[in-house]
């Protein structure tokens, strides 16, 4: 009888544990069902990265003095600085500079500590490739400026906060019956119309 009661007690505990596990999972599901959809139709729509977004590193060869500060402050000693000493001028001559973005953690230390500001973080995040060796950028590839989301004619830029009603900063506070993030509210349309008309007016272009 004692063994039977122990089995029943163990079965009840396991049933309660399974029920709690199921409740936790469904509570998350139902919580998201009440939220506003924020689907972005990538790659035809892209969210504009934040002002301090840490994307692909941009490098200016002419500013670099081959001091190797970026190598010393990098947690994984990633940047490869190839230089030779000029015996006549007694100064370093930079030959090549490369960064492997397959290993880079985008911490931004190299940008922060660079004495000549030859390194900067860009908004580019589309670095996917079939061959990981293509992620090893030399000074020529690092020197290319990426296409900005707002200037790319093939992409519709999305400013996430601009799609929310006035005074609302959290998309979860908006009713699910309202328009999705991909549609502009009337207030933003009214704000954009004067600028669009100015750009399309030839008289305004001539005056400028």
Swiss-Prot record:
InterPro entries: 4Fe4S_Fe-S-bd, 4Fe4S_Fe_S_CS, NADH_quinone_OxRdtase_chainI, NDHI
Source species, domain of life: Bacteria
Catalytic activity: a plastoquinone + NADH + (n+1) H(+)(in) = a plastoquinol + NAD(+) + n H(+)(out); a plastoquinone + NADPH + (n+1) H(+)(in) = a plastoquinol + NADP(+) + n H(+)(out)
Residues given in the record as [4Fe-4S] cluster 1 binding sites: 64, 67, 70, 114
Cofactor stoichiometry and binding remark: Binds 2 [4Fe-4S] clusters per subunit.
GO cellular-component term (any): plasma membrane-derived thylakoid membrane
Major subcellular location class: membrane
EC category name: translocase
Annotated binding of [4Fe-4S] cluster 2, by residue: 74, 104, 107, 110
Parts of the chain that traverse the membrane: none
The family this protein is said to belong to: Belongs to the complex I 23 kDa subunit family.
UniProt function note: NDH-1 shuttles electrons from an unknown electron donor, via FMN and iron-sulfur (Fe-S) centers, to quinones in the respiratory and/or the photosynthetic chain. The immediate electron acceptor for the enzyme in this species is believed to be plastoquinone. Couples the redox reaction to proton translocation, and thus conserves the redox energy in a proton gradient.
Assembly mode: NDH-1 is composed of at least 11 different subunits.
Protein name: NAD(P)H-quinone oxidoreductase subunit I
Source organism of this protein record: Prochlorococcus marinus (strain MIT 9515)
Gene name in the database record: ndhI
């Amino acid at each position: 009888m004692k063994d039977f009661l122990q089995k029943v007690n163990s079965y009840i505990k396991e049933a309660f544990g399974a029920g709690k596990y199921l409740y936790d999972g469904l509570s998350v599901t139902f919580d998201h069902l009440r939220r506003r959809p924020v689907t972005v139709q990538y790659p035809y729509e892209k969210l504009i990265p934040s002002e301090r977004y840490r994307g692909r590193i941009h490098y200016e060869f002419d500013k670099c003095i081959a001091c190797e500060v970026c190598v010393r402050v990098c947690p994984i000693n990633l940047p490869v600085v190839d230089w030779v000493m000029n015996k006549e001028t007694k100064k370093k001559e930079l030959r090549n500079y490369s960064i492997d973005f397959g290993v880079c953690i985008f911490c931004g230390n190299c940008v922060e500590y660079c004495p000549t500001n030859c390194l900067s973080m860009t908004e580019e995040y589309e670095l996917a490739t079939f061959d990981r060796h293509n992620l090893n950028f030399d000074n020529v590839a690092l020197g290319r400026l990426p296409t900005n989301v707002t200037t790319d004619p093939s992409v519709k830029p999305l400013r996430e906060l601009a799609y929310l009603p006035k005074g609302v900063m959290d998309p979860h506070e908006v009713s699910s019956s309202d328009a999705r993030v991909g549609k502009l509210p009337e207030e933003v349309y009214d704000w954009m119309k004067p600028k669009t008309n100015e750009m399309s007016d030839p008289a305004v272009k001539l005056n400028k």
